[in-house]
Each structure stands twice: as C-alpha cells, then as structure tokens.
A protein has these predicted regions:
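Short linear motifs in intrinsically disordered
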Residues: 32-37, 67-75
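Terminal and domain-flanking low-complexity segments
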Residues: 89-141
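Short, surface-exposed polybasic-and-hydrophobic patches located at secondary-structure transitions
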Residues: 75-96
Length: 141
C-alpha cells in the first residue's frame, strides 16, 4: 500500500525540518563562541556557517567597540553585547556576559582611552556606568 502526501504537506515537513536545523545551529554557534585573553592578546573562536574559525588580535588593533545591547535587572547585567571593529577590517560580536566583561576589563587596564570611549557611548546615566564598574571589580578571569 502506497501513501501519497500532497505537495503542501511535503513542503511543510521540509520547512519544519529546516527551522529545527536553524535553531540547533544557532545554539551550537552560541555555545562554540569563546574569547581567550593573555596579556592583551585575544583569540576569538566562533563557528561561521559550518567551519570553525579563529581571529587573533591585540587590544591595540581595536578601532572601535560599540555596545549594542544591555539588559540590567536588580543591579546586575542579564545581557550585554558588543560589536568590535578591528583595524584590518574584521568585525565580530561578543554575546556572552563573561566575554564582554573580560574585554572591558582588559580595555580598562591596557587602553584607558578606548574604555572611556566605550563608557561615553552608553546612552544612560551614571547608574549604568557604576553597575559596569561594580561588575568589572567583581569579575575574575
């Protein structure tokens, strides 16, 4: 006995499989992102499409860093995201709280002018900046 599915049902099944694949890949990409630091040198590991890639850069190669997302609840960060632009044209996004705090801490220690520029671009009052300072003081590498 043969069962024939109508064309819309087949299209719907393939669409659901595609959506599930995208969701799984998004979670894999997020979990695979990693930022490591040693004396101002960074290695950012990420998955682009299917292939794992790495970007090596020094803190002095950072041209600009833009705070793209911040969500604060009960005096601490829940979410913080940065877009980082390098001198050689590369750009990438830090989406994990610990990686963003690591980058900010190295900026505060090694490149104070970049750190002050990042803080000046935050469209908020001093309470957000004081929360950032407190989080950085409590952050351990």
């Amino acid at each position: 006995m043969k069962i024939y599915l109508p064309l819309p049902a087949i299209i719907l099944i393939f669409y659901l499989i595609y959506i599930i694949f995208l969701i799984v890949m998004k979670k894999i990409r997020f979990n695979a992102e990693n930022l490591e630091e040693l004396d101002g040198e960074f290695i950012f590991t990420f998955i682009k499409k299917i292939k794992k890639e790495q970007i090596y850069f020094h803190i002095d190669e950072v041209k600009m860093c833009v705070l793209t997302r911040i969500f604060i609840r009960e005096g601490t960060f829940r979410t913080i995201n940065f877009n980082i632009f390098l001198n050689d044209g590369y750009n990438f996004r830090l989406r994990k709280k610990n990686e963003c705090l690591l980058f900010l801490q190295v900026c505060r220690e090694k490149r104070k002018e970049l750190y002050q520029k990042i803080l000046s671009m935050i469209p908020a009052d001093m309470t957000v900046i004081s929360i950032i300072e407190r989080e950085l003081d409590n952050f351990k590498r």
